Swiss-Prot record:
Pfam families: DUF4750
Transmembrane segments: 10-30
Domain of life assignment: Eukaryota
Annotated localization: Membrane
Organism name: Danio rerio
Stated family: Belongs to the SMIM13 family.
Source lineage: Eukaryota, Metazoa, Chordata, Craniata, Vertebrata
Name this protein carries in UniProt: Small integral membrane protein 13
Keyword Repeat tagged: no
Cross-referenced InterPro entries: DUF4750
GO terms under cellular component: membrane
Amino acid sequence: MWQSVGLTVLVIVATLICVLLFMLFGWYVVWQLFLSKFKFLRELVGDTGSPQAETEPSESESERSSPPTPRQRPKTARQRVIPPDSTT
């Protein structure tokens, strides 16, 4: 009687451990292949030491080193909005 109960408990515990390990391994693989590419998710997890985070240049460095793209190109005098002088 007690042997069958013990064996049943052992099977249930072993099954739960196997399922938990399988889920953790799956999350690790998904993180490495897909989720770690998103900066927002890395910030949520607090992952600042990843190689990808270190190799990505900051915005100020990339703006200085790269030529201006059409979005970053300075506006011409006609396109600029000049604020009215408050001294007059």
